[in-house]
Amino acid sequence: MELNDAIRTTFSARDYTGEDLSDETLYDILETARFAPSGGNRQGNRVIIVRDQSIKDRISDLNLPAAKRYVAQVNAGENPWNAVVPTKVADAEIAATEPAALLTEPFKMASVVLVFLVDLKVVASVDQ
């Protein structure tokens, strides 16, 4: 398959089979990703590989405030996480909103979670 075909026909998967991902496959993926563009090509990224279920559960919990905000903004007819138009949804309403499972459960269900970090002091932030 040509790259152009792959890009145009591959969907954005949000469901997981529960199938384990071998270290070899994971390292192959990360090695290939290493060649992707980065700010100024300075490679300021790091990846933490998480397989421990208790840590994946904690990552899911850390996502709860963002998931609640997303749902509250959608319910209010807003475009969630919009950087141009500030939200009119009150903090109390956001806190009382039930988060959507699709924004939190995937962290728990995946066989592995990759946490990507970038040192902004290293890369060139060309999108200022």
What are these model-derived regions, one by one?
Residues 31-37, 46, 101-102:
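Short secondary-structure capping/turn segments at boundaries of alpha-helices and beta-strands
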Residues 1-31, 42-43:
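Specificity-determining recognition surfaces
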Residues 14, 36-40, 66, 70:
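Short secondary-structure junctions and interdomain/linker hinges
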Residues 26-32, 94-99:
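Short amphipathic alpha-helical surface micro-motifs
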Residues 9, 32-35, 61-65:
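Residues within well-ordered alpha-helical secondary structure of globular protein domains
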Residues 5, 39, 104-106:
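Short secondary-structure boundary/capping segments
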Residues 49-128:
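Glycine/small-residue-rich phosphate/adenosyl-binding loop
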Residues 40-52:
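Short loop-to-beta-strand entry elements in the cores of soluble alpha/beta enzymes
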